[in-house]
């Protein structure tokens, strides 16, 4: 397996730490006036999703994680697993609830998602940046009710709750940014 030195650390790099794949979020190289240089790294453990900060001596080396990102289409959820398919080879992969996590509320059938595989098992699922979902439940917007600019909560077809403008009604389709969970616009 290939190794990587702390001198080569950069955001997005995936390496093994304590036999668990980790991804670097931020890396800062520090050279104090006295003593040895070091890297202050903010990283995310890919299996547990936990974020932590660590410092590594300059020149330390680590094994690169054998992690692969693949684009797959979301098919369905059978209650236990979420099923995805490669649209070229038609190979199907099942991801458990732990791998999907909070992203389940943004999964729409036939949307292309990014799955991170480690040892051919899905460890994280990333939905597309934007999804279009139907509003299934929201309060009616009252005419003249413009006192607050915060909008109103709306429940979407996947169960996600998003703040929308007052003019959005039940049955309308809205575009939502899955990274922030914010309303982007109304789909015509």
Curated annotation (Swiss-Prot):
GO terms for molecular function: translation elongation factor activity. Keywords: Cytoplasm, Elongation factor, Hydroxylation, Protein biosynthesis. May be beta-lysylated on the epsilon-amino group of Lys-34 by the combined action of EpmA and EpmB, and then hydroxylated on the C5 position of the same residue by EpmC (if this protein is present). Lysylation is critical for the stimulatory effect of EF-P on peptide-bond formation. The lysylation moiety may extend toward the peptidyltransferase center and stabilize the terminal 3-CCA end of the tRNA. Hydroxylation of the C5 position on Lys-34 may allow additional potential stabilizing hydrogen-bond interactions with the P-tRNA. Disulfide bonds: none annotated. SMART domains: EFP, Elong-fact-P_C. One of its GO terms (biological process) is peptide biosynthetic process. Pathway: Protein biosynthesis; polypeptide chain elongation. GO terms for cellular component: cytoplasm. InterPro entries: Elong-fact-P_C (IPR015365), NA-bd_OB-fold (IPR012340), Rib_uL2_dom2 (IPR014722), Transl_elong_fac_P/YeiP (IPR020599), Transl_elong_KOW-like (IPR013185), Transl_elong_P/YeiP_cen (IPR001059), Transl_elong_P/YeiP_CS (IPR013852), Transl_elongation_fac_P (IPR011768). Involved in peptide bond synthesis. Alleviates ribosome stalling that occurs when 3 or more consecutive Pro residues or the sequence PPG is present in a protein, possibly by augmenting the peptidyl transferase activity of the ribosome. Modification of Lys-34 is required for alleviation. Belongs to the elongation factor P family. This is Elongation factor P. It comes from Aliivibrio fischeri (strain ATCC 700601 / ES114) (Vibrio fischeri). The lineage of its organism: Bacteria, Pseudomonadati, Pseudomonadota, Gammaproteobacteria, Vibrionales.
């Amino acid at each position: 397996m290939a190794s990587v030195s702390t001198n080569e650390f950069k955001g997005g790099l995936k390496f093994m730490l304590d036999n668990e794949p980790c991804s670097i979020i931020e890396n800062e190289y520090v050279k104090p006036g006295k003593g040895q240089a070091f890297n202050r790294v903010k990283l995310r453990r890919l299996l547990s999703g936990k974020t932590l900060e660590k410092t590594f001596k300059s020149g330390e080396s680590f094994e690169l994680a054998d992690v692969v990102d693949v684009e797959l289409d979301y098919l369905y959820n059978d209650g236990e697993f979420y099923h995805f398919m490669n649209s070229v080879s038609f190979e199907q992969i099942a991801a458990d609830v732990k791998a999907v996590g909070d992203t389940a509320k943004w999964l729409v059938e036939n949307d292309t998602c990014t799955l991170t595989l480690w040892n051919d098992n899905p460890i994280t699922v990333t939905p597309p940046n934007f999804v279009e979902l139907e509003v299934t439940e929201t309060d009616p917007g009252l005419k003249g009710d413009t006192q607050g600019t915060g909008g109103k909560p709306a429940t979407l077809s996947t169960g996600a709750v998003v703040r929308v403008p007052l003019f959005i009604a039940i049955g309308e389709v809205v575009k939502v940014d899955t990274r922030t969970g914010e309303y982007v616009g109304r789909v015509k």
